[in-house]
Regions:
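Sequence-level preference for short, compositionally simple segments enriched
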Residues: 2-350
Length: 350
């Protein structure tokens, strides 16, 4: 073979490898990585050492509703942060899960607060984005309700973040929310609320609960007209690393609201899930009967069998592809209309 042909073949191979690398790297939002920074928080960067100080500065300095980007350098930030509705289109960029950590300890039992007030980070603003940040509540299982993050704004997107707590870790309170490649840790009702929330390619890790039951989701949907629910797609449900759940019954969800709606689809479910799958909210069996909607679609893994799932009302739903399509990013949260501008990668359909 002539030298020029060999060089040409080597060029093609190199180009193919580079293209593959670009495809693999495509899951990382490049524009987020290269976003223009308005503020930097952390040691050695500026005089701003706390996130609360950065938020206050942003409120004072920004003009209009143009996106405002705050870089939060690696470190543990022991503070409770509130992002009010007067700061829409805010982005917090961390240095990665387990590196940039926002940590709090407030709880219902330990601080005489409502669940709503315990959040380490509260997002009331629309258009919020976070990437590469751990949101943590260290109160522990015995402290009962202790929220790591509460989101009440619309069009919130989280990429490669971690949410760590026990009971009531992630409060998806209101609005359209999207979580991509995130880790959620908890023991009881640790994804809960009345938002339109989709979790895609996430790890959902169950921790040791205070009692003998562990429950992942608790939808607060109260009206059949509400287009709300908790959707888990292409994700992995497992015991938290190092956690032993012998003697513990683990359930996919229980109904906090009269018309609770949760859908688990195209996900891998480990053997920790009880064969019945779903649990009643104690004392509300007759109230919620035939109103709740729990569905599963094309899940895999030893905990995915629906043969012994509970059989009450709409709780036992093995849905068709046409039905599952209604719970995709495109259909359920109208993601095609707003997620592209966040630069967070997503799959719009099944």
């Amino acid at each position: 073979m002539e030298l020029k042909n060999i060089r040409f073949l080597l060029f093609l191979v190199s180009w193919a490898l580079l293209a593959q690398c670009r495809i693999d790297a495509g899951s990382i939002p490049r524009r987020l990585k290269a976003a223009k920074l308005d503020l930097v928080v952390g040691r050695g960067a500026t005089n701003i050492r706390t996130i609360k100080e950065a938020i206050a500065t942003a409120v004072q300095n920004r003009t209009g509703d143009k996106r405002y980007v705050i870089k939060v350098k690696a470190g543990v930030y022991n503070e409770n942060v509130i992002i009010d509705d007067n700061l829409p289109n805010l982005t917090l960029l961390g240095d990665g899960k387990g590196k940039t950590i926002i940590s709090g300890y407030l709880s219902v039992l330990g601080n005489n607060l409502t669940t709503f007030q315990t959040a380490t980070v509260t997002v009331d603003a629309d258009g919020f984005i976070a990437r590469g940040i751990t949101f943590r509540n260290t109160a522990g299982a015995k402290a009962e309700q202790a929220v790591a993050l509460r989101v009440s704004g619309d069009r919130a997107a989280f990429y490669s973040c971690s949410f760590e707590g026990y009971q009531d870790t992630l409060y998806v309170h209101h609005g359209r929310q999207f979580y991509k490649k995130c880790d959620i840790y908890g023991s009881l009702d640790f994804i809960f609320g009345n938002a339109m929330a989709v979790f895609q390619n996430c790890n959902i890790y169950v921790r040791q609960p205070k009692s003998k039951d562990a429950v992942i989701t608790a939808s607060k949907r109260e009206d059949p007209k509400n287009q709300t629910g908790i959707i888990i797609q292409r994700s992995h449900i497992a015991a938290a690393p190092g956690t032993h759940l012998e003697g513990i019954k683990v359930y996919l969800g229980r109904p906090w609201g009269h018309y609770a709606r949760t859908v688990i689809m195209q996900s891998h479910i480990d053997s920790l899930i009880d064969p019945e799958g779903w649990l009643w909210w104690a004392g509300k069996e007759d109230v919620f009967k035939d109103k709740i909607y729990y569905a599963e679609f094309k899940n895999t893994g030893p905990g995915s069998s629906t043969a012994r799932r509970v059989d009450w009302g709409n709780a036992r739903q093995v849905i068709t592809p046409q039905q599952a399509e209604q719970f995709t990013v495109d259909k359920f949260i109208d993601g095609n209309s707003w997620l592209p501008s966040t630069n967070v990668p997503f799959s719009s359909g099944l």
